[in-house]
From Swiss-Prot:
Domain of life: Bacteria
Name recorded for this polypeptide: Universal stress protein MT2052
Listed Pfam families: Usp
SUPFAM superfamilies referenced in this protein's UniProt entry, alphabetically: Adenine nucleotide alpha hydrolases-like (SSF52402)
Lineage, top ranks: Bacteria, Bacillati, Actinomycetota, Actinomycetes, Mycobacteriales
Keyword ATP-binding recorded: yes
UniProt xrefs under PANTHER family: STRESS RESPONSE PROTEIN NHAX (PTHR46268), UNIVERSAL STRESS PROTEIN RV2623 (PTHR46268:SF27)
Keyword Phosphoprotein: no
UniProt organism field: Mycobacterium tuberculosis (strain CDC 1551 / Oshkosh)
Induction / repression: A member of the dormancy regulon. Induced in response to reduced oxygen tension (hypoxia) and low levels of nitric oxide (NO).
Family: Belongs to the universal stress protein A family.
Keywords: ATP-binding, Nucleotide-binding
Residues that bind ATP 1: 13, 128-134, 142-143
């Protein structure tokens, strides 16, 4: 990764949920591998308890204000407890010399806008797959879902520990399609694989149709082979610079005529990490989240880093 980005820290958002606990452990290990600071935060939103209707007595307004103050004070006290506990979890997941680089903080404001603004200033934001109060088996939590659509940099979404657990040598998987965000995904994936000392599986699924839907029967064998060769060369070109930069990473190239999402989901079942671009070859600048990245994140099968490129040119990537 770029020297400027590598020196930036990692922020993990917490809320006291089991997924949040797992996200803190993951973030602590990743920050240690990068040798950067880890900031544990919880955002406390404002409490609004205005009386119903347009007309109300001043005494009712005062009562509502008092309830708001009491409820907000309770939420702040609870947030400090959650951050303190998460800070301990981060310390336990890190080596003894990391204590000075791990901090905890309670912030105030709307949750998603606050974390989105923070994402401008850090290497990555880490969140749990589901937040407090989420039902088991539910889809992606509202905060995680919103942040992967609006953040100004990479966002890691961490599910509870997958079953069966992934072995330490499980590979990192990255989806490559030639788009700018998949280029950033390749950079992140090579860096993560190198730091973890594991292989990298680079998938290029180059059809928007399944293999049975593709009109292969209308192609002459030589034409089909030429098309496959072209796709394999494209993947090799996309990876060559990163392979030169990370010669220690063993790369397994997978090129298939298929839709990307099902193949990435298949590979995610045995991966310790999946890296995808926020939107692929069918996307456009400013697009929030593509169908492939959304499917992979929503599956909750493995930790996923969504590579997002800042829209503001003044913000470092």
């Amino acid at each position: 990764m770029s020297a400027q980005q590598t020196n930036l820290g990692i922020v993990v958002g917490v809320d006291g949920s089991p997924c949040s606990h797992t996200a803190v452990e993951w973030a602590a290990r990743d920050a240690q591998m990068r040798n950067v600071a880890l900031r544990v935060v919880q955002v406390v939103p404002p409490v609004i308890t205005a009386p119903e209707g347009w007309a109300f007595e001043y005494s009712r307004f005062q009562e509502a204000q008092k309830r708001e103050i009491v409820e907000h004070s309770y939420l702040v006290a609870q947030a400090h407890q959650i951050v303190e506990q998460a800070h301990k979890v981060a310390l336990e997941a890190s080596s003894s010399g990391r204590a000075a680089q791990i901090t905890g903080e309670v912030l105030h404001g709307q949750i998603v806008p606050t974390l989105t603004n923070i994402s401008r200033q850090v290497a990555m934001v880490v969140l749990g797959y589901r937040g407090q109060g989420a039902v088991a088996g539910a889809l992606l939590g509202s905060v995680s879902s919103s942040l992967v659509r609006h953040a100004h940099g990479p966002v890691a979404v961490i599910p509870e520990e997958p079953r069966p657990a992934r072995p330490p040598h499980a590979p990192v998987v990255v989806g490559i399609d030639g788009s700018p965000t998949s280029g950033l995904a390749a950079e992140i994936a090579f860096d993560e694989a190198s730091r973890r000392g594991v292989d990298l599986v680079a998938l290029h699924a180059w059809s928007d149709m399944g293999p049975l839907d593709f009109p292969r029967l209308n192609w002459a064998p030589i034409e089909w082979r030429n098309l496959e060769d072209e796709q394999e060369k494209m993947l090799a070109r996309r990876l060559s610079g990163w392979q030169d930069r990370y010669p220690d990473v063993v790369v397994h190239k997978v090129v298939v005529c298929d839709r990307p999402a099902p193949r990435l989901l298949e590979l995610a079942q045995t991966a310790q990490l999946v890296v995808v671009g926020s939107h692929g070859r069918g996307g456009f600048p400013g697009m929030h989240l593509g169908s492939v990245s959304r499917a992979v994140v929503n599956s909750g099968q493995a930790p996923v880093i969504v590579a997002r490129i800042p829209q503001d040119p003044a913000v470092p990537a």
